Amino acid sequence: MKTIRRLLALLLLAGAAQANDLRLTIIDLDADDLACGLRYTAIAGKVRDSMAIMKAREFEQSDHEMLVAIATVRRPADCASDVIVTVRKAVTLAGNEKFRTRDNRAYLELCRHGGIVVSPIKDHERDFLKQVERSVQVCFGQLTF
């Protein structure tokens, strides 16, 4: 049931993001998912592609670069999850610039490799995913912060 809810949330987010001409995919995996999500057949291809892109090239900080960020988010019980964030384009940010969601539940920041990390991801509720999507739009200048 939890997996089904995750997939539905991803589908809802994908639909909303396409409507705004922004593709945003968030795949959050439990720490014990050593296969990086490959056991979920619905997203296995996306995970493989994202990992291949991430390993194949170093990203330049460019306004028109597709970025795939893989980050580990530490959680209270020393639990970590792999987070894969794919965006269509990204803006160039200084290393210390951050964009917080309006409720401060998450923030976006530029990684060393030029990717965007979303942290922390505490749940998979639709409201949370919408907040992340809005933050990415703010980052791209599509919304005023």
Enumerate the language-model features and the residues they cover.
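A short, hydrophobic beta-strand-centered structural micro-motif
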Residues: 52-53, 57-89
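C-terminal/domain-edge helix-coil "capping" segments
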Residues: 99-145
